[in-house]
C-alpha cells in the first residue's frame, strides 16, 4: 500500500511540476512581449508618463481616442464642457480630461520631434 501511495504522490508532483514549468514559460514570454512594447515607446514617452501621472493608453481611454492625431485630441473640448462644474458635473472628471489632453499633447510633441530628427539624419 505504501508503494501505491508513493507512486500517486510522485505522479502528482510530476503533473504539478510540468504545469508550473509551462506557466513559468508563458509568463516569461508575456513579460518579454510587454518589455518589447515598452521599449518601442521610447524614453521620452516614459518620462512624460511619469510627469503627468497618466500613461498614453490611459489618456487615450479618457478622451475616447483610438489613434493619436491632433484632430482626435479636439474631443477634449466637448468633454471639458460636458464635465464643467457650473453645469453640475464633477471637477475631478474635468481635471482628468485636462490631464489626459496635456499627456496627449506631450506625446504629439515627442512624435513631431522624433520625425524631425529622422528627417535630419543623413541617408547612408
UniProtKB/Swiss-Prot annotation:
Region (J-like): 58-109
Matching InterPro entries: J_dom_sf, Tim16
PTM-bearing positions, type Phosphoserine: 69
Top-level division of the source organism's lineage: Eukaryota
Gene3D superfamilies linked to this entry: DnaJ domain
GO CC field: TIM23 mitochondrial import inner membrane translocase complex
Subunit-structure text: Probable component of the PAM complex at least composed of a mitochondrial HSP70 protein, GRPEL1 or GRPEL2, TIMM44, TIMM16/PAM16 and TIMM14/DNAJC19. Interacts with DNAJC19. Directly interacts with DNAJC15; this interaction counteracts DNAJC15-dependent stimulation of HSPA9 ATPase activity. Associates with the TIM23 complex.
Protein name stated in the entry: Mitochondrial import inner membrane translocase subunit TIM16
Source organism of this protein record: Rattus norvegicus
Lineage per the UniProt record: Eukaryota, Metazoa, Chordata, Craniata, Vertebrata
Gene this chain is encoded by: Magmas-ps1
Amino acid at each position: 500500500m505504501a508503494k501505491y501511495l508513493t507512486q500517486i504522490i510522485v505522479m502528482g508532483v510530476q503533473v504539478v511540476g510540468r504545469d508550473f514549468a509551462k506557466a513559468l514559460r508563458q509568463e516569461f514570454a508575456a513579460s518579454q512581449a510587454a518589455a518589447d512594447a515598452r521599449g518601442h515607446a521610447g524614453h521620452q514617452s516614459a518620462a512624460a508618463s511619469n510627469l503627468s501621472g497618466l500613461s498614453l493608453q490611459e489618456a487615450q481611454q479618457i478622451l475616447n481616442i483610438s489613434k493619436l492625431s491632433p484632430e482626435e485630441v479636439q474631443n477634449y473640448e466637448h468633454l471639458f464642457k460636458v464635465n464643467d462644474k457650473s453645469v453640475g458635473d464633477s471637477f475631478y472628471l474635468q481635471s482628468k480630461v485636462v490631464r489626459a489632453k496635456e499627456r496627449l499633447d506631450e506625446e504629439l510633441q515627442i512624435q513631431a520631434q522624433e520625425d524631425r530628427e529622422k528627417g535630419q539624419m543623413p541617408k547612408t
